[in-house]
Every structure is written in C-alpha cells, then in structure tokens.
Amino acid sequence: LLNFYNTLKQLGFNPKHIVDIGANHGTWTREALQHFPDAYYTLLEPQSWLKDSMLDLLEKNDKINFYPVGAGEKNGSFNFTIVDRDDSCSFRYTKEEAEREGFKQIEIPVVALNDLLLDSELPTPDIIKIDAEGLDIEVLKGASNYFGKTEVFMVEAGVVNKVFSNSFLKLINFMDENNYRLFEITDLNRPFTPNVLWLVELVFVKKNGFLDSKIIS
C-alpha cells in the first residue's frame, strides 16, 4: 500500500475526496491521511459502535464524515451477522447460516453510494476503497454513477476463497466492462494453513484517465 501511495504522489495525483467503505476502526483512513492530509474523507461502517475508535479523527478534522451504515447495490435494511472478529462481520450470511454457526444477526441500514452522495457538495470521489467482505461487486453496482468519474477504485477479490462471490476473475471482468484497468495489487492475504492465497487487494484506475495516461508503455 505504501508503494502505491508513493506512486500516486510521484505521478502528481492529489485526491480531493476519498471514500472508505468498510472503515472498521479507521486504520485504512489513518494511513491515507498520512499521505493525503488535505482531502475530504467519507467513511461508511455498518458497526456504529466502532465510531468510538475513530473519535479522535472525527473531532479534530471536520473534513472527515462518518456514516453508520452499510453500502450496497440498493437502499434498504438487511441482516448483518456479528462474528468473532469485527473485521469479518458481514451482510453475506443467510439467516440459516448464522443460526447454524451460532452467530447473532441484527438489522442494519444499507445505502447505495449513488444515493448517499447524491446531494453532497463535496468533490466527486477521486478514490473509492471498498472492503465489503465478499460483496464488493454489489457495492460497486451501487456506486455506478462514479464509473468514468472516479479515478481509483480499491477492492478485495477472492482467489482460493470460494465463499466470496467476488472472485478475482469476476472482479477483473466487471471492472474491465466498466472501463477500469488493473493498476496495482496492494496486498496478498494468506491467513490460513496451508499458506494458500486467500484474498488479494486490487487497485483499478480509469482507462485513459489521469493515472493510466501517465504510464508509458
């Protein structure tokens, strides 16, 4: 991730508005702030109780806005499953799956980014980061207004992971169809034994956009 941020700065990319979907405790935003301290930040996190871990950011920086909601393709209220780790809680589980595993479910509001930012006076997002525990494509569909406008999308994709619907292949094809090119891989996630490649974190940039045009083949 550090290499990617350094590349952005070397290419003269200066984002004015950054969206963090699945902000959790704000760790990703904290790192982004070190590189882009003057940007506006819009944070979405369905676990409203995690806001307390970000109060220091929210209280000292009025350019950071926090929304205690999930992001998806459409607006509504959906069952959110609470699991052992707060960074793995998800809208992905069915009622039956949650009951079988002994997990609690609560109903939480979900918004499409298209609607959340519809009347916003903030600049169009330059970077949209998505960590949606396997539902990244649904979130992207709800952010379709920004295809062709937002320069950078950062998303997760499953590799060996058969649970996530957003496989590497599906995500590459989806972004290609919407005129985005794979630009960087910022993380290779190997959390289990055997040490297989479970997830990757990918960066896509707009085809023929600012960043894509800077790379000379």
Task: Report residues per predicted region.
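Phosphate/nucleotide-binding beta-alpha loop and adjacent structural elements of enzyme active sites
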Residues: L1-S217
